[in-house]
Every structure is written in structure tokens, then in C-alpha cells.
Amino acid sequence: AIAGLKNKGAKKFIIDLRENSGGFMDQAINMVNEFLPANRLIVYAEGKAYKRFEAMSDGKGSCIHEPLAVLIDEFSASASEIFSGAIQDNDRGIIVGRRSFGKGLVQQQFTLSDGSAVRLTVARYFTPSGRCIQKPYELGKADEYEKDFLNRLMHGDAGNKDSIQHAD
């Protein structure tokens, strides 16, 4: 897709991840790899019983030098946050929009003996600078989620999509 756009003369790129609820980590890594030079950390994940995993760029991407902007909103989650976090932390492009959803968990599927499966959270992922995107939760402090949402609502950060002020 990128090669086709470049063949048609595209010189700058905007990746719109608004309302993108995510996907698979490997696909996010493949996408980011298109925009980063070699040997840049894309994402890492670790958990209590999950060996640390690091994904590095290979420098073979087709848009390593072109200007880049990434659009996100409060519904951009998971793989969208991996992509935007890697672009931001590697100073590769500009991130425009609202604070993202905050889903930074790695899930693994386990097949059961009857053929069904269960997906369990096994780790958290972190952006190259070490930020964990996952919203914090401490047992017994669920009201913090509500306080966060109310604070965002009061400051026009949760419901008003036109909260950015600009001159006419």
C-alpha cells in the first residue's frame, strides 16, 4: 500500500488511528518498522512469568525519511498505542489528537483439552522510553478510574471533540 502511494507521488504521510481499538502486536511492529531506521526499539514487554521481549526495527522500511503524523483519540488502543508510542519515543513523527485509551496488556491464547481456548493477560508492554500505556489499577481503588474520567470530562477531554482552540 505504501509503495503504491509513493508511486503516485506521496511525500508525506498521515496515519489515522482514531477509533482503532487495536489488533495484534506483531502487526503493529510490522507497521512501525516501515517508518523507523535500523536498530531502534519499537516496543518491549515483560511480566512476572513472561520473559522480556524486545522488538527492534530492521531499517528496511519504505518510509524511513518521509514526514509523518499520527492521529489518535480516546478510542485508540493496544496496537494503535504501540504504533504511536514507538513513533513518538523515537522522534520519528508528530502525534496529534487526544489521550489514548490506555490498554497496554499482552494476552496469550491457551488451548484447552476440549478444543476451546482462553486468552490470559501475561505481560504489559512498554514504549521505547519505558512508559507503560496500561492504566494503573490497585486493588480496592477502582474509584480512581471514575475520578480520572470525571476529570477528563470536566476539562473537555472526554466528550468534546472540538476542545482544541484556534484563531479564525
Task: Name each model feature, range by range.
Residues 1-113:
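Cleft-lining beta-strand/loop regions that shape enzyme active-site pockets
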Residues 119-120:
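Short, small/polar residue-rich loop motifs at catalytic or cofactor-binding pockets
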Residues 128-168:
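Conserved functional hotspot residues or short segments at active or partner-binding sites
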